[in-house]
Amino acid sequence: MAMLLKNKDQMIVSMGPHHPSMHGVLRLIVTLDGENVADCEPVLGYLHRGMEKIAENRTIIQYLPYVTRWDYLATMFTEAITVNAPEKLANIRIPKRASYIRVIMLELSRIASHLLWLGPFMADIGAQTPFFYILREREMIYDLFEAATGMRMMHNYFRIGGVAVDLPYGWIDKCLDFCDYFSPKISEYEKLIVHNPIFLERVKGVGFISREEAINWGLSGPMLRASGVQWDLRKVDHYECYDEVDWQIQWQKEGDSLARYLVRIGEMRESVKILQQALRIIPGGPYENLEARRLHQSQNLEWNDFDYQFMGKKSSPTFKLLKQEHYVRIEAPKGELGIFLIGNDSVFPWRWKIRPPGFINLQILPQLVRGMKLADIMPILGSIDIIMGEIDR
């Protein structure tokens, strides 16, 4: 690849591809003028697996295990959007208990995602200690996931019309205990981090995005709300049962890396509030829509039938996707996660277009780092919160 230098004193540095445990396999081609960043070009595609094309050759249920590999730190959200798309297309109603279970799982996943954003973000700046505290709390969330779904990651828990299984006995009490334990820990993080003068020097006023720029670039999630835009799809689209609990949109008006940090810290507090309310008022009833399952039952099996004897697990509903198109979106930890689904009277989608929040949010990175110091690239990149699995797809 030929690259022309505008100034003979400029230097080109290739940052990355980074290790998957940090910001994913992202490569940055940085043009430096001394220690100042003259230009920056993100290079994508190292984790491209053809997720959209795979979806066109699978039924929705067959495709569910794949979607947890998009954003592998917030897999509940990728599962939710995958089942929401055919639910909206076929107008399938969700039982109230299933909707509450989904909200509980989504908010736990949001906290886990923000925690694993905060740890590497602080490590990028040079603070290693918070990383270990954060992993301690995140481990408790994964224990809750394992008890409810059987898996710590890649849960495969959501189903068309509800969820795979009901919450086990005693799980709600354990989750409430976690909320009581975790809520003061957020204040402990703030005391440890926000009052650190070195941290403030590294993030305050760094990576500024104005309100107009955030809207024009199509940013979403904490990137948008940190620039003074009160936009949260949980309030805007009124999906699941978020209207039945009391919570507030977290936003800041400064638009810098510190504001994006404060928004995510505030969102963890609001997620705990949502969890505590949902766990206390969760209704009884079914955890799945039985009508959705009946769509798949072609015949009543007899006791001695071969198929009946060897059916180890109840079948999941697979039905034809009507010849329609629909866009569905949810508020993921990183922003607006959307699916544009086109049906063609087949069990396979004709088109499955993924709208990943990280891909759109990453586009503003060259503008943010231009004119900054080389050392400012990592705090700015960390404040965006990207996962290459959903960016490259």
Swiss-Prot record:
Q: What Gene Ontology cellular component terms go with this record? A: chloroplast thylakoid membrane
EC number(s) given by UniProt: 7.1.1.-
Where is this protein localized, as stated in its record?
Plastid, Chloroplast thylakoid membrane
What membrane topology does this protein have?
Peripheral membrane protein
* UniProtKB keywords: Chloroplast, Membrane, NAD, NADP, Plastid, Plastoquinone, Quinone, Thylakoid, Translocase, Transport
- Family affiliation: Belongs to the complex I 49 kDa subunit family.
Q: What is this protein called?
A: NAD(P)H-quinone oxidoreductase subunit H, chloroplastic
